[in-house]
């Protein structure tokens, strides 16, 4: 072959292109790279670009049958990480044609499928992705989005309230449905299947769906509000998952649920399409996320998983709590909360946002705060997350000394008090405890909740730590 020279080659000759001007259609990635000792950062960055696009370890003669320049990933910028020795941020640009339209699965297979086991790297973390409108427009995205959800539920101007039914495993379907009814009758908008409630011997999915639907209809009739229970449709096969979603639709309930990481992006996208076609809202749980995102120097940051979910489709997704954690993490969390909700998000490194992201018309996702929160956190949660969020109190509802319904009442009263105080111009960050105390004077349910949880106000680590 003309110009074909066999042998192993330096990646950086082909894949490190510091002069490259990124295109509006490129998918851009920011990797945190920790090279092995003796490997220069340019070579490591180029290796990442190569292995996640067209490269292989040696020159192959079939390279001559295509235009590598058109299809290769390019490492176009490298910067050291402040305060970390031998860590670098490598920026890689991928041409759009490397990816199948409308497939988060293919996007991840390409970008993170192979390169993380690469020998020249000690560790590698995908910190952020810039999804160009040319690509995001090939996705349906969330089945409904924030505004349509509010219109379907007829609930405006406040966060929504939820509760995970506990104990998560072992209840019989009828008792489960009863706990569900008590919570939504007391004032919550939603109750939730735990992520590992699928269809176990002690409670098969169909029984649970029936009793929860009964709870929803009874509570709706008594309160005049629209209620829901996140019926977990996650299953062992895609076909079984869709079967469960179909049954939920036949019962006329408003929302189903999916574990998108354990279930997989292909299953999740199928379910999201079904939900849009059939008017079901879709609640997403992120079970398994910490396996991928917890290590600071290896894996994938949750903001990337959140962007992927917005493309694949979901109306709610769990996003940590912020409360009782460090200030810095608060900014990072709010960064990906904005990436979930807003149409246009400016690059802001202090919030971990490496690229300006323009979602154009892709609907937004409601962030869900859950994990170790209770009534004393309500002012902080209202302040931090704003109206477009779901606040979920599992133990913070079911752990009420007077039981489930009063627990739900306490949470609803606390929320309404915080929203009213905020609307009157009071500063929840400063006066939050006072707002809760005032409300508890006329709500015995809230007073009892305040009493039982006063010891642990703000002094614990949230269970949902990133």
UniProtKB/Swiss-Prot annotation:
Catalysed reaction, written as an equation: 2 (2R)-3-phosphoglycerate + 2 H(+) = D-ribulose 1,5-bisphosphate + CO2 + H2O; D-ribulose 1,5-bisphosphate + O2 = 2-phosphoglycolate + (2R)-3-phosphoglycerate + 2 H(+)
A single BP term in Gene Ontology: photorespiration
N6-carboxylysine: residues bearing it: 192
Superkingdom: Eukaryota
Localization per record: Plastid, Chloroplast
Gene Ontology molecular function terms on file: magnesium ion binding; monooxygenase activity; ribulose-bisphosphate carboxylase activity
SUPFAM superfamilies: RuBisCo, C-terminal domain, RuBisCO, large subunit, small (N-terminal) domain
InterPro entries linked: RuBisCO, RuBisCo_large_chain_AS, RuBisCO_lsu_C, RuBisCO_lsu_C_sf, RuBisCO_lsu_fd_N, RuBisCO_lsu_N_sf, RuBisCO_lsuI
Site (Transition state stabilizer): 325
Major subcellular location class: plastid
Modified residues (N6,N6,N6-trimethyllysine): 5
Cellular-component GO terms for this entry: chloroplast
EC number: 4.1.1.39
Residues reported to bind Mg(2+): 192, 194-195
Cofactors: Mg(2+)
Cofactor: how and how many bound: Binds 1 Mg(2+) ion per subunit.
Keyword annotations: Calvin cycle, Carbon dioxide fixation, Chloroplast, Disulfide bond, Lyase, Magnesium, Metal-binding, Methylation, Monooxygenase, Oxidoreductase, Photorespiration, Photosynthesis, Plastid
Residues engaged in binding substrate: 114, 164, 168, 286, 318, 370
Post-translational modification: The disulfide bond which can form in the large chain dimeric partners within the hexadecamer appears to be associated with oxidative stress and protein turnover.
Matches recorded under Gene3D superfamilies: Ribulose bisphosphate carboxylase, large subunit, C-terminal domain, RuBisCO large subunit, N-terminal domain
UniProt-annotated catalytic positions: 166, 285
Complexes and interactors: Heterohexadecamer of 8 large chains and 8 small chains; disulfide-linked. The disulfide link is formed within the large subunit homodimers.
Family: Belongs to the RuBisCO large chain family. Type I subfamily.
Miscellaneous comment as given in the Swiss-Prot or TrEMBL entry: The basic functional RuBisCO is composed of a large chain homodimer in a 'head-to-tail' conformation. In form I RuBisCO this homodimer is arranged in a barrel-like tetramer with the small subunits forming a tetrameric 'cap' on each end of the 'barrel'.
Protein name, entry field: Ribulose bisphosphate carboxylase large chain
Gene transcribed to yield this protein: rbcL
């Amino acid at each position: 072959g003309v110009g074909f020279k066999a042998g192993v080659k330096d990646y950086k000759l082909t894949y490190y292109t510091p002069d490259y001007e990124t295109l509006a259609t490129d998918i851009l990635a920011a990797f945190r790279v920790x090279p092995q000792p003796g490997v220069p950062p340019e070579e490591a960055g180029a290796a990442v670009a190569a292995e996640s696009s067209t490269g292989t370890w040696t020159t192959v003669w079939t390279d001559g049958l295509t235009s590598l320049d058109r299809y290769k990933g390019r490492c176009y910028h490298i910067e050291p990480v402040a305060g970390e020795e031998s860590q670098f941020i490598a920026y890689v640009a991928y041409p759009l044609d490397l990816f199948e339209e409308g497939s988060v699965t293919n996007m991840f297979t390409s970008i993170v499928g192979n390169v993380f086991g690469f020998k020249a790297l000690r560790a590698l973390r995908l910190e952020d992705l810039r999804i160009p409108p040319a690509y995001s427009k090939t996705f349906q995205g969330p089945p409904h989005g924030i505004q349509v959800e509010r219109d379907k539920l007829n609930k405006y101007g406040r966060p929504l309230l939820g509760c995970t039914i506990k104990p998560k495993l072992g209840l019989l379907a009828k008792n489960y449905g009863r706990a569900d009814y008590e919570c939504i009758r007391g004032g919550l908008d939603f109750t939730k299947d735990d992520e590992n409630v699928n269809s176990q011997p002690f409670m098969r999915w169909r029984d649970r769906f029936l009793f929860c639907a009964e709870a929803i209809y009874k509570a709706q009739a008594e309160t005049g509000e629209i209620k829901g229970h996140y019926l977990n449709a996650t299953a062992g096969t895609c076909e079984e998952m869709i079967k469960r979603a179909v049954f939920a639709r036949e019962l006329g309930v408003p929302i189903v649920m999916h574990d998108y990481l354990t279930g997989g992006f292909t299953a999740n996208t199928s379910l999201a399409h079904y939900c849009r076609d059939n008017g079901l809202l879709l609640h997403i749980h992120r079970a398994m996320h910490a396996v991928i995102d917890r290590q600071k120097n290896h894996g994938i940051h949750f903001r990337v998983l959140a962007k992927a979910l917005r493309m694949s489709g979901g109306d709610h997704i769990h996003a940590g709590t912020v409360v009782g954690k460090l200030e810095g993490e608060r900014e990072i969390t709010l960064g990906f909360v904005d990436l979930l909700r807003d149409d246009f998000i400016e690059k802001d490194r202090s919030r971990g946002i490496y690229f300006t992201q323009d979602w154009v018309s892709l609907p937004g996702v409601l962030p869900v705060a859950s994990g170790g929160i209770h009534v004393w956190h309500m002012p902080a949660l209202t302040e931090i997350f704003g109206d477009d969020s779901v606040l979920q109190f599992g133990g913070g509802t079911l752990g009420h000394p007077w039981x489930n319904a009063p627990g739900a009442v306490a949470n609803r009263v606390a929320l309404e008090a915080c929203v009213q105080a905020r609307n009157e111009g009071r500063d929840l960050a400063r006066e939050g405890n006072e707002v809760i105390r005032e409300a508890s004077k006329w709500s015995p349910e809230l007073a009892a909740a305040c009493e039982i949880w006063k010891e642990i106000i703000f002094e614990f680590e949230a269970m949902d730590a990133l």
